[in-house]
Swiss-Prot record:
It comes from Caldicellulosiruptor saccharolyticus (strain ATCC 43494 / DSM 8903 / Tp8T 6331). Signal peptide: none annotated. Belongs to the RemA family. HAMAP family: RemA. This is Putative regulatory protein Csac_2087.
Length: 101
């Protein structure tokens, strides 16, 4: 990426944050090859389950060979990669309001 000096963070659901610069793919978990990738990552200790027990809707593959499971749709995660500022501004505003109480 051209912004290698900047770290872009994206929310993948339930307050879990991933570095957008490390993403290789955001895919649906439904196909057999992706299910195999998930199982292999689990066996290697490289699986991160960020679903909080919810149904896996997106599988995020990183450049470090980590596989991250998210309960957020792949399209939503992709949108957050493209437009990350909007999502964080909303999250920060909510947190600031809670801190002021």
């Amino acid at each position: 990426m051209s912004n290698s000096g900047n770290i872009k963070l994206i929310n993948i659901g339930f307050g879990n944050i991933v570095s957008a610069n490390r993403l290789i793919a955001i895919v649906s978990p439904d196909s057999a090859p992706i299910k195999r990738i998930i199982q292999e990552a689990r066996e290697r200790g490289m699986l991160i389950d960020a679903t909080y027990g919810r149904r896996t809707r997106a599988v995020i593959i990183t450049d470090s060979d980590h596989v991250i499971l998210s309960a957020v749709q792949p399209e939503t995660v992709a949108h957050r990669v493209i437009e990350p500022e909007e999502d964080f501004e909303e999250d920060i505003d909510v947190e600031d309001e809670v801190d002021k109480r």
